[in-house]
Amino acid sequence: MEDKIKHKLRIGWSYLLFLKQRVIHDRLTVSAGYMAYITLLSLVPLITVLLSVLSQFPVFSGAGETVQAFVIQNFVPAASDAVEASLKEFISNTGKMTAVGSGFLFVASVMLISSIDRSLNYIWRVKKKRRPMYSFSLYWMILTLGPLLVGASLAATSYVTSLKIMDDEIVSSFYRTLLGWLPIILSFSAFVGLYLLVPNKKVRVTHALIGAMSAGCLFEFSKVGFAQYITQFPSYQVIYGALAAVPILFVWVYLCWIIVLIGAEITASLGEFEGWLTGKVSVNILESDIKALTEQQGLIESDSTDPESK
């Protein structure tokens, strides 16, 4: 019994060493910074495209503002009022753009989705790229069907709220509790979908669930920690004044991408490590074994910071 426990502890420690080596090799913080930069450039265009899709359907009138407020209040900790005001101002300015400018907004939105696709496929060591037509169809589907699904869920929520059964105290209390858990459920579902669907290779559901759970827990802890830091140490307001929302948003987006990529690294490394353990005969797993595994997987330091060049 004691030997089994020691063996499992060795396996767990070996996996952590392998994961650490993988994260260092992939330069996760550099990739997160790149993704944060692309996100900030594409955030307003993406939201504008999503809102414009919703505005084409009268049944979803007003849903765009509700989605925007919900996302900011539940996924941007602290200073949400300042961030929301800045985003609304930026988005309102896009209404003055010409057709050519609107086309550039769409291109910027696709650029963000393409960057996510490229970064995650690099983590999974996918060398075979999707066909351009397939990729374009996938991005188009995300930008069109995504807003419709969100709008439909909001409409369904409003309908359920208006039902007479909601007057019952027990049902109403359960419904409010469910709504309180909704942000956590949505973030977990988004992580699972991201880790299952984006890589251009088969990913085991159990691995995606573990990676999504890890990323979801980190995300919730980060929201609390970041909010505490912002409220307890508001030096950013003294330094930046009215522009304080910009660095707050940038730091938070950067932190979010670190969490997303850590979850992806966990999901991808589970498959590699599990396959390696299957062929391992000896019960003594040492650091030298991890070095051999990392060399086998090609985890050798590279001077390049571009995923496409590795």
UniProtKB/Swiss-Prot annotation:
Membrane topology reported for the UniProt record: Multi-pass membrane protein
Segments passing through the bilayer: 34-54, 97-117, 136-156, 178-198, 207-227, 242-262
Keywords per UniProt: Cell inner membrane, Cell membrane, Membrane, Transmembrane, Transmembrane helix
Domain of life: Bacteria
UniProt keyword annotation of Transmembrane present: yes
Coarse class of the protein's main subcellular location: membrane
Location relative to the cell: Cell inner membrane
Similarity field: Belongs to the UPF0761 family.
PANTHER family: INNER MEMBRANE PROTEIN YHJD, UPF0761 MEMBRANE PROTEIN YIHY
Protein name, as recorded: UPF0761 membrane protein VF_0100
Source organism per UniProt: Aliivibrio fischeri (strain ATCC 700601 / ES114) (Vibrio fischeri)
